[in-house]
Amino acid sequence: VSKAYRGGRQALQKVDFHLRKKEMIFLSGHSGAGKSTLLKLICAMERPSDGKIHFNGHDITQIANKDIPFLRRNIGIVFQDHRLLMDRSVFENVALPMRIESASENDIRHRVSAALDKLGLLDKAKCLPSQLSGGEQQRVGIARAVVNRPALVLADEPTGNLDPELSNRTMQIFEEFNRAGVSIIIATHDINLINSRPQHRRFELNQGFMSEVEGYGQ
């Protein structure tokens, strides 16, 4: 798949890879290498200039705009800047994807509470995001991404603003969800973090081109 922006800047050039079912991989590269662009293409936030992306047997590059919400039911997204609603409680932020789906209040209460409990945030359910630390806000973003039990989670620099201890704990959380059957792509420039988990395959983007890095995923 390729992606060019106005002015001719080539963000991605003939990127070709396969994410196995229930696999967790790292996507590395310097700032501006195309990591965020690739994640946006996978969840149909942007369209490729050329090529196809297949997810669950469907070519999502051909998906109609009206069908994108159905696609995103199966894809959870963790943003680098959290993108929390600052005037809503932690509970309501996590519940948002379920409310968009018109889930029942009983399901919302049960699944949001379970997600917050899993991430150690149940006691923060009534707090506003501004009352939380950066690490806690990041975990709220993760809870929101997984509350719909997606098949795939895309995480864009999820440890970018965290200290090493919190970064490690965040990765442990992703690995727990991965063991539960969720496929995960983590975009990060933190090589130390990647090297601490060599069991996961690593792909690197450089000037829009992707290659698999040897020595990972053994």
Outline where the language-model segments fall:
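A short, proline-enriched helix->beta-strand linker immediately N-terminal to the Walker B motif
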Residues: V147-A151
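Short coil-to-helix segment of the ABC ATPase nucleotide-binding domain corresponding to the Q-loop/switch region
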Residues: R88-A95
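Conserved ABC ATPase signature
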Residues: L128-L132, E136-Q138
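ABC ATPase NBD coupling module
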Residues: R6, I60-G76, R179
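Catalytic Walker B motif of ABC-type/P-loop ATPase nucleotide-binding domains
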Residues: V153-D156
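Conserved ABC transporter NBD signature motif
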Residues: G51-D59
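Helix-to-loop junction immediately C-terminal to a conserved catalytic motif
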Residues: C43
